[in-house]
Amino acid sequence: MTTPQEVLKRIQDEKIELIDLKFIDTVGTWQHLTLYQNQIDESSFSDGVPFDGSSIRGWKAINESDMTMVLDPNTAWIDPFMEVPTLSIVCSIKEPRTGEWYNRCPRVIAQKAIDYLVSTGIGDTAFFGPEAEFFIFDSARFAQNANEGYYFLDSVEGAWNSGKEGTADKPNLAYKPRFKEGYFPVSPTDSFQDIRTEMLLTMAKLGVPIEKHHHEVATGGQCELGFRFGKLIEAADWLMIYKYVIKNVAKKYGKTVTFMPKPIFGDNGSGMHCHQSIWKDGKPLFAGDQYAGLSEMGLYYIGGLLKHAPALLAITNPSTNSYKRLVPGYEAPVNLAYSQGNRSASIRIPLSGTNPKAKRLEFRCPDATSNPYLAFAAMLCAGIDGIKNKIHPGEPLDKNIYELSPEELAKVPSTPGSLELALEALENDHAFLTDTGVFTEDFIQNWIDYKLANEVKQMQLRPHPYEFSIYYDV
């Protein structure tokens, strides 16, 4: 634990000039306010720094816009992308009128989830290990106007560039990963080794416990970096650093990164598989003598995730693009089942050896368009509901789900086919979130209304380029 006094001393000792205060909005994007170093003191870590919250997506109206950012001293790190020595600090949000934590602040909701876990007596720590995939592109252009709508992506690794004619200063040297064949090739096919290495080492300098990096399955520059699991809020903080570092290192190399689940048609999308477990008094609770070495509690946790999965996906897969990834044929977990080692199931129990501390489950549906604080909190609530109500997940599905007969497949529940359907499921099933006191009814309704009005309905209003291909000459 780091104290406010230690942070203030560091500012003086390391001659920090600016303090960059970061907080996350409802949708999942970091926002920031930069202060001169003499503008914070010990009270900033308790009373907070005032700001106008009226322009933050999904937050206050303009007539009640005053809010405060409360600095978390445990999150201070030197920003490697600022020219002037700058200390970044992550904040949670308070209501200045009441002094209460703001019920729409995702980081506050995440803390409530931990408090709820402790209050149940089930455990005292929830660990999460997200694996967020992404694409590195050389160019990304898109526009939507009254008379046009398009996107154009390009990558030096794109299989579509295999026949592209080069120039004298930039010849085509081949070695493009083919569709669905991008997993683990060495250079020169993997042209992003050095970029990923810099991303990984930069994260390490910021205190993220790094593990690995590698190319992913899709053509066009799909990659993944790995970091160690952490406590719920800690892991969410690390994931935000992960995205921040990856985007900014890519920019340094003249590249651009997206965490969209399905930017490329006809190839694998990008997910964010979430490993998770509950501990108490320093001991893991998911290891036992049941299926795949799980405890009964671990199975009940799976039961909660599977029961509430359609509603959960409105939070863990919260974009219209999410459901273009969740389709058969691209290693996507479209069927709601669990299995040991079977990556075609939506929940997998990894083969983790004999160490009980490594026993965990992996929920494979989520993607990185989710807000990690909200996603982790919602998954924990669903799992706890399974434990409290002893929701058994049924028999595991150890077959390859993609090879089941139509009759067998009809018996396996599937993920919602669209964001609208997921939001409808959340509308009908959210007591497991609100009865806990973790999420408020106000937050859930605001989330549903925001997503419907600003994303679902907006997509429905606009002509799609493919519609012209199939309907123009009717």
Swiss-Prot record:
ATP binds at residues 211, 275-277, 343, 348, 357. Binds 2 Mg(2+) ions per subunit. Keywords: ATP-binding, Cytoplasm, Heterocyst, Ligase, Magnesium, Metal-binding, Nitrogen fixation, Nucleotide-binding, Phosphoprotein. The modification O-AMP-tyrosine is found at residue 402. It is an enzyme of class 6 (ligase). Pfam families: Gln-synt_C, Gln-synt_N. One of its GO terms (molecular function) is glutamine synthetase activity. Its cofactor is Mg(2+). Residues 14-99 form the GS beta-grasp domain. It catalyses: L-glutamate + NH4(+) + ATP = L-glutamine + ADP + phosphate + H(+). Involved in nitrogen metabolism via ammonium assimilation. Catalyzes the ATP-dependent biosynthesis of glutamine from glutamate and ammonia. Oligomer of 12 subunits arranged in the form of two hexagons. Belongs to the glutamine synthetase family. This is Glutamine synthetase. It comes from Nostoc sp. (strain PCC 7120 / SAG 25.82 / UTEX 2576).
